């Protein structure tokens, strides 16, 4: 990532929520495109704003679960509008965790401790959780032995509380940013999508946009880490004017993708979802189908 690592100020966050809810948005994804959400020392203040906002119905986020402590995990159980939080686990033991994440043994120990703490808390509290597990392709769910505290903790959570567990052994190329050279020496495969056909605009630029920490509005919340698909800036524009057919930058992006013209980050992206193909992931997330004409009508009303 080339952009500076910054944390969104609370005042900007509050303003975004106010503008978005006035437009009719009521569910919010809080995960930054890169980085750990709990690195924001004031994150719980943001959550409190969402909890007390009359027009916010729900929110969700991902975490690598290495930054929290027991007190923070317990605070999550008091959140009424948290629809689900997803834990991203990398590796299956200390060695694989360190090699994949480039973090140290302290971070590994903290992750295992937090998973064990979560297991204890869930015996007395109700939290909607899912776990995404990414590790070596040769891993076969070993849980025995002193070095398998991580895999043992993950399996125990799944079995004890029926937590959805999604295991991935193919790694995304992040729009061509990640290549096989980046995982050299690791038992990992990077998905190569240089030849993936792209027909029509990507559906993500219609429903999965993101406000960056600096106020830029980016048309992709999934893989465009450097905001090359930015369509506006809240430091000088209203959100209603950015998500509108009055915003020529946004309209040009849609039109160019409809013509089959994709920017470099999109050309190599393995996360592309054509508006002309209903993807199975939408069934999992219960996404209703919307036509392009209906989208244009919505933007016209903004």
Where does each model-flagged region fall?
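Conserved glycine-rich "GG(E/T)P / GGGxP" loop and the immediately following alpha-helix
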Residues: 1-169
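Short cysteine/histidine-rich metal-coordination sites, predominantly Zn2+-binding motifs
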Residues: 8-12, 281-295
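Intrinsically disordered, low-complexity polar segments enriched in Ser/Thr/Pro and acidic
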Residues: 38, 60, 106, 254, ...
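C-terminal accessory region of radical SAM enzymes
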Residues: 114-116, 120-130, 155-197, 216-217, ...
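Short, small/polar residue-rich loop motifs at catalytic or cofactor-binding pockets
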Residues: 202-205
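Short, acidic, Ser/Thr-enriched surface-loop or helix-capping motifs
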Residues: 211-212
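Iron-sulfur (Fe-S) cluster-binding modules
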Residues: 299-302
């Amino acid at each position: 990532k080339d952009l500076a690592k910054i944390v969104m100020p609370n005042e900007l966050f509050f303003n975004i929520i106010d503008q978005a809810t006035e437009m009719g948005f009521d569910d919010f994804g809080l995960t930054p495109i890169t980085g750990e959400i709990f690195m924001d020392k004031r994150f719980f203040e943001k959550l409190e704003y969402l909890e007390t906002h009359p027009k916010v119905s729900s929110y969700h986020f991902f975490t690598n679960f290495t930054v929290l402590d027991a007190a923070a995990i317990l605070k999550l159980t008091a959140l009424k509008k948290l629809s689900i939080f997803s834990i991203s686990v990398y590796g299956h033991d200390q060695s694989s965790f360190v090699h994949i994440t480039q973090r140290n043994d302290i971070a590994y120990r903290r992750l295992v401790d937090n998973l064990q703490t979560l297991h204890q808390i869930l015996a007395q509290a109700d939290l909607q959780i899912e776990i995404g597990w990414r590790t070596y392709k040769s891993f076969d769910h070993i849980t025995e032995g002193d070095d398998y505290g991580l895999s043992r903790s993950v399996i125990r959570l799944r079995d004890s509380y029926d937590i959805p567990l999604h295991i991935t052994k193919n790694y995304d190329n992040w729009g061509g940013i990640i290549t096989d050279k980046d995982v050299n020496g690791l038992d990992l495969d990077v998905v190569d999508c240089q030849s993936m056909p792209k027909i029509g605009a990507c559906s993500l630029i219609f429903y999965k946009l993101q406000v960056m920490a600096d106020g830029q509005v980016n048309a992709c919340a999934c893989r465009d880490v450097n905001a090359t698909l930015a369509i506006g800036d809240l430091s000088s524009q209203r959100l209603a004017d950015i998500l509108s057919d009055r915003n020529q930058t946004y309209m040009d992006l849609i039109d160019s993708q409809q013509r089959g013209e994709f920017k470099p980050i999109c050309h190599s992206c393995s996360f592309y979802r054509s508006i002309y193909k209903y993807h199975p992931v939408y069934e999992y997330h219960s996404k209703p189908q919307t036509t392009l004409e209906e989208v244009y009508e919505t933007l016209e009303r903004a």
